[in-house]
Curated annotation (Swiss-Prot):
Family designation: Belongs to the HAD-like hydrolase superfamily. PpaX family.
Catalytic reaction annotation: diphosphate + H2O = 2 phosphate + H(+)
The protein's role, per its UniProt record: Hydrolyzes pyrophosphate formed during P-Ser-HPr dephosphorylation by HPrK/P. Might play a role in controlling the intracellular pyrophosphate pool.
Keywords: Hydrolase, Magnesium
Catalytic residues (UniProt): D9 (nucleophile)
Protein name: Pyrophosphatase PpaX
GO MF entry, a single one: inorganic diphosphate phosphatase activity
Record keyword DNA repair present: no
Pfam families: HAD_2
Length: 216
């Protein structure tokens, strides 16, 4: 079966939001729980939904913590977000070659749109599925299934690209092929343990991989 659809995670995959996310967590946690959290303590919070993360910290303050996080994140977004090498050119080429491309993210739509506009990627994506559009987040298959449905694509014709185990396992649960990115903050070995079909060292590695898959 040939691949005609590529789904991407956003944070840490298409755009480098790591410093923004870490700073947003540290600001929020220092505000409510001074001197209790260091940088290394918040690294595991990258990937899960804000609700899941803050529920484990303080069940009684979840919405308050999310509001604080999102306010800081919004205010400092453009100064702390960077593009990854070859992302723009690769997505542009995928569109030129006729691939359907979508984003599946656990972020809220407003922040997603800010990131896509800043990186000038907003012109390319046919479908963007955010946490606002689903009941369940990755690794549950629902977000990927929704994106595939909106794109008119089948799982066996799709590839999911991401920087976290939620993306790889989410793709596996939905029945797509999977590609992990080696620039993940979690480290290459961490993602290799989840057995993605492919490992990308830069986003442009996608192009020869897809070409090979569609030739065989």
């Amino acid at each position: 079966m040939k691949i005609n659809t590529v789904l991407f995670d956003l944070d840490g995959t298409l755009i480098n939001t790591n410093e923004l996310i870490i700073s947003s967590f540290l600001h929020t946690l220092h505000t409510y729980y001074p001197n209790q959290y260091k940088r290394e303590d918040v690294l595991p919070f990258i990937g899960p939904s804000l609700h899941d993360t803050f529920s484990k910290i303080d069940e009684s303050k979840v919405e308050e913590l999310i509001t604080s996080y999102r306010q800081f994140n919004h205010d400092h977004h453009d100064e702390l977000v960077e593009e990854y090498e070859t992302v723009y050119e690769t997505v542009q080429e995928l569109k030129k070659q006729g691939y359907k491309v979508g984003i599946v993210t656990t972020k809220a739509r407003q922040t997603v749109e800010m990131g896509l506009k800043l990186s000038k990627l907003d012109e390319f994506f046919d479908v963007v599925v955010t946490i606002d559009d689903v009941e369940h987040v990755k690794p549950h298959p629902e977000p990927l299934q929704k994106a595939l449905q909106l794109l008119g694509a089948k799982p066996e014709e799709a590839l999911m690209v991401g920087d976290n185990h939620h993306d790889i396992v989410g793709g596996q649960n939905a029945g797509t092929k999977t590609a992990a990115v080696s620039w993940t903050l979690k480290g290459r070995a961490y993602l290799e343990a989840y057995k993605p079909d492919f490992m990308l060292d830069k986003m442009s590695d996608l192009l020869p991989i897809l070409s090979d898959m569609n030739r065989s």
